[in-house]
């Protein structure tokens, strides 16, 4: 798994290289780091980093619902159409493991956000 923090990696050649070696790229939902939703390996790792400690569940219910749908879509072998991809080519179809890590600056409400996501995807 590779986590990039510079937009210079947002090029199709980088995605092709990761796919060649079946290496997942981290999807970072972050204000600074690039968000790359391309599926490049046999699992997806998402870092949800825009939570808000003012919200009891870290994210508003509509956003939690949207994330649950995305995570389920990835798990079922699909790809969310509402997240940015670098390469328009679709990944191989098929079920895959999905790991979602809820974390942000304050971290106080991140566990509540993770528990809410678990309830929505199970």
What are these regions (language model features)?
Residues 1-122:
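Residues lining hydrophobic/aromatic ligand-binding pockets adjacent to catalytic sites
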């Amino acid at each position: 798994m590779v986590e990039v923090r510079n937009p210079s990696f947002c090029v199709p050649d980088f995605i092709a290289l990761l796919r060649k070696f079946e290496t997942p790229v981290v999807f970072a939902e972050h204000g600074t780091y690039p968000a790359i939703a391309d599926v490049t390996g046999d699992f997806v790792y998402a870092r949800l980093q825009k939570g808000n400690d003012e919200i009891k569940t870290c994210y508003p219910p509509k956003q939690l619902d949207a994330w649950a749908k995305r995570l389920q879509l990835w798990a079922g072998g699909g790809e969310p159409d509402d997240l940015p991809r670098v390469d328009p080519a679709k990944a191989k179809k098929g079920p895959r493991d999905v790991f979602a890590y809820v974390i942000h600056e304050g971290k106080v409400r991140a566990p509540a956000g993770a528990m809410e996501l678990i309830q929505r995807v199970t």
